[in-house]
Amino acid sequence: MSRIGRLPIPVPSGVDITVEGATITVKGPKGTLSHVVAEPIVVNTEDGRLLVTRPDDERRSRSLHGLTRTLVSNMVTGVTAGYSKTLEIVGVGYRVQAKGSDLEFALGYSHPVPVKAPEGIRFEVQTPTRFVVHGIDKQLVGEVSAKIRGLRKPDPYKGKGVRYQGEVVRRKVGKTGK
């Protein structure tokens, strides 16, 4: 039995969960998320908790058991507390500014780089070199953050670029002069 999949998912008050066939819909104070559960896995509600079970011990069932439990747990956390990722910009002249609900970056290119906020994502600019990506879908928050980081990855020689808060950038030693 999967150690993670075996754990029940506590459902806080204010969260409404409906299971219709293979689709799980989670409604909470911050919004609504839904997920289609893969074939062999079954999700049941039982006195204020969700239980994820598998019918057999086939390899596919075992691998999907813990995954499904974690995805549903992330949905419950997302609609109650939400997710956020803080990113920092390091470099002379590198900055970010809010343009309505979107962001505009100056990252050393000859043009500003606009980033539109997808549905369900909210940007918060704290300083010109620090901003936060907020949302209820953990996967979408991570994906948008990774795309923004990919606009100018941290340089291993000078450390310039967009990085996650607390990310350690391994630095290389430059060439030695003669």
From Swiss-Prot:
Which cysteine pairs make disulfide bonds?
A: none
A GO biological process of this protein is: cytoplasmic translation
Q: Which UniProt keywords apply?
A: Ribonucleoprotein, Ribosomal protein, RNA-binding, rRNA-binding
**InterPro entries reported in the protein's UniProt record:** Ribosomal_uL6-like (IPR000702), Ribosomal_uL6-like_a/b-dom_sf (IPR036789), Ribosomal_uL6_a/b-dom (IPR020040), Ribosomal_uL6_bac-type (IPR019906), Ribosomal_uL6_CS (IPR002358)
Presence of keyword rRNA-binding: yes
GO cellular component entries: cytosolic large ribosomal subunit
Q: Which GO terms describe its molecular function?
A: rRNA binding; structural constituent of ribosome
Keyword check for RNA-binding, yes or no.
Answer: yes
The organism's superkingdom is given as Bacteria
State the NCBIfam families in the record.
L6_bact
Family note: Belongs to the universal ribosomal protein uL6 family.
Instruction: Please describe what this protein does.
Output: This protein binds to the 23S rRNA, and is important in its secondary structure. It is located near the subunit interface in the base of the L7/L12 stalk, and near the tRNA binding site of the peptidyltransferase center.
Q: Which HAMAP family match?
A: Ribosomal_uL6_B
Give the multimer and partner information: Part of the 50S ribosomal subunit.
What protein am I looking at? Large ribosomal subunit protein uL6
> What organism does this protein naturally occur in?
Frankia casuarinae (strain DSM 45818 / CECT 9043 / HFP020203 / CcI3)
